[in-house]
Amino acid sequence: MRVAVSASGQTQLDELNPRLGRCEYFVIVDDVSGETWAIENTGRLSTGAAGIATATLLHNHQVDVVITGNVGPNAFTALEAAEIKVYTGTKGKVQDLLEQYRNGNLSKASGPNVGPHGS
């Protein structure tokens, strides 16, 4: 299983960036192999539909779960269509959020928690 966290930097020591579509990076952990790596969120460069572009990026990297602060309706729909589970309303360091996820201490989102464009 691959878990991605929207991040302000490229390591597990960096803070979560709460904006799914506009975060700089995703730190990805493969729970099977234990491998960790970061990808640049090229979706953030979109002039519109950054959340959808970001969902496509995560799908292309075979992500199963994404942990973030906020997700809008278009991004949530795209993530749901890609069968990527979404956990929102989080904050803190990437490593702490991954630990909370592994321990079952994060709540799966049932829908978007912000309006379009982060409003």
Language model feature labels by segment:
Residues 1-53, 60-61, 80-82, 89-119:
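Non-catalytic interface/targeting segments
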Residues 69:
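Conserved residues at the C-terminal ends of beta-strands
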